[in-house]
Amino acid sequence: MAEVKKSIPKRRFVGKKNRKENNLDGSNRDVENAALVTINSKRSAGRVATQIPEDILNDKAINEAIKLLPQNYNFEIHKTIWHIRLRKAKRVALQLPEGLLMFGCILSDIFEQFCQVETIVMGDVTYGACCIDDFTARALDCDFLVHYGHSCLIPVDQTPIKVLYVFVDIKIDLQHVVSSLKHNLPSNSRLALVGTIQFVGSLNSIKDALQIQDEDGKGGFYVVIPQAKPLSPGEALGCTSPYIEKGSVDALIYIGDGRFHLESVMIANPDLPAYRYDPYSHKLSIESYAHEEMKSIRYSAVEKARTAKKFGLIQGTLGRQGSPKVLENLKNTLRKNNKDFVCVLMSEIFPSRLGQFSDIDAWIQVACPRLSIDWGYAFPAPLLTPYEASAAFNVVPWKEVYPMDFYATNSLGNWTPNNPENRPLPNRKKTGPVSS
């Protein structure tokens, strides 16, 4: 009997951590120190709700309450109060990721005081935009949901209750970002800027400042902000990132903390040198990823799954992670290949839980692709993504560049939710016959 400890990973597969090495120009400058310079740090006015009534914007009590929240975090309180009142909501659900959950009680108090509503703070884990829990909010008899910290991945016309997405833009030290990049990267380089949704609003200001050439010759960068629709320009998710045409830029610049979203962009663009600027620590670091090791591990799982006799199909139930249409497409693929399978609904997927299904030879999970990429080696049987399952049964060839297009509208095939084959038809108003 195998030891349990061996099946529990000490860390997830993250390639390699940041390292110090030569910069693009061959120098070995410390990428964590940069001199400050003065730039135009005007903030983008995008996403401002211009229709908010003046009596809400100028309400002294509301503005005093807002001061209880961090001033560099934009929780869009005025806009939220306006929407709650406009919709005549009675019970409002507040869904926040773990990093913002500490502000849940303050937000709840504000809306109960100024909107005369009952609020429910949803405390279940929220990993990303795919975890929006509109169905649970409806089951709790809520008529309005405010989802914080993520982009509008599930359109509001596809939710059973009214939903307001609040990105929670975070103000950062734009001067330090730009000076750090100008100090450490060769002038006139071609750069691609990406980040998480909290910092996407700052990317255009950073781009404008980087394109300016200073008197000392630094700067003058050619900067692009790539987009993977339906995401915002420059936005990266852990499973969906923009593909940047090979040779079009010299380096990738990621604005954000942590590596999870950055790794997605690096996987999609394996030939690009990558830098990460952490707005909290004010450090610029060179990042790397063990692409060949990751692809070798994943292809080995695909090869092993090809000989499996019985499959387990996991439909993720954490928020909106699962996709009934993707699941049905996978069922059809397994049927065509005469494979036996069983469907399992699961909110979170753990090795110990799947280990209880001793008769399953391989798994395919419609939840989070990164679960297989980062943790797949830790499971007792191959745990494939929908893309990997499609490659296993020759629906699509194995790609040299691992695709990170799970929510992209131009994805490779019907094993992704937003592929044209799987997208729901738009709601159209019925019209009567036209009289002549």
UniProtKB/Swiss-Prot annotation:
Q: Which residue intervals make up region (Disordered)?
A: 1-27, 417-436
Tell me the cofactor note: Binds 1 [4Fe-4S] cluster per subunit. The cluster is coordinated with 3 cysteines and an exchangeable S-adenosyl-L-methionine.
Q: What happens when the gene is disrupted?
A: Sensitive to methyl methanesulfonate (MMS, causes DNA breaks) and hydroxyurea (HU, ribonucleotide reductase inhibitor).
Reactions accelerated catalytically? L-histidyl-[translation elongation factor 2] + S-adenosyl-L-methionine = 2-[(3S)-amino-3-carboxypropyl]-L-histidyl-[translation elongation factor 2] + S-methyl-5'-thioadenosine + H(+)
Cofactor (UniProt): [4Fe-4S] cluster
Q: What is its EC number?
A: 2.5.1.108
Query: Bias category Basic residues: which stretches?
Result: 7-19, 426-436
Predominant location category: cytoplasm
Q: Where in the cell is it found?
A: Cytoplasm
Instruction: List the GO cellular component terms.
Output: 2-(3-amino-3-carboxypropyl)histidine synthase complex; cytosol; nucleus
Assigned keywords, A-Z? Cytoplasm, Iron, Iron-sulfur, Metal-binding, S-adenosyl-L-methionine, Transferase
Instruction: Name its pathway.
Output: Protein modification; peptidyl-diphthamide biosynthesis
Please name the GO terms of the biological process aspect recorded for this protein, alphabetically: protein histidyl modification to diphthamide; regulation of cytoplasmic translation
Q: Where does [4Fe-4S] cluster bind?
A: C130, C239, C368
Task: Give the function comment from the record.
Answer: Catalyzes the first step of diphthamide biosynthesis, a post-translational modification of histidine which occurs in elongation factor 2. Dph1 and dph2 transfer a 3-amino-3-carboxypropyl (ACP) group from S-adenosyl-L-methionine (SAM) to a histidine residue, the reaction is assisted by a reduction system comprising dph3 and a NADH-dependent reductase, predominantly cbr1.
How does this protein assemble? Component of the 2-(3-amino-3-carboxypropyl)histidine synthase complex composed of dph1, dph2, dph3 and a NADH-dependent reductase, predominantly cbr1.
**Sequence similarity:** Belongs to the DPH1/DPH2 family. DPH1 subfamily.
For this protein, the record's PANTHER family field holds:
2-(3-AMINO-3-CARBOXYPROPYL)HISTIDINE SYNTHASE SUBUNIT 1 (PTHR10762:SF1), DIPHTHAMIDE BIOSYNTHESIS PROTEIN (PTHR10762)
Q: What is this protein called?
A: 2-(3-amino-3-carboxypropyl)histidine synthase subunit 1
Q: Which species expresses this protein natively?
A: Schizosaccharomyces pombe (strain 972 / ATCC 24843)
**Which taxonomic lineage does the organism of this UniProt entry have?**
Eukaryota, Fungi, Dikarya, Ascomycota, Taphrinomycotina
Please name the gene that encodes this protein: dph1
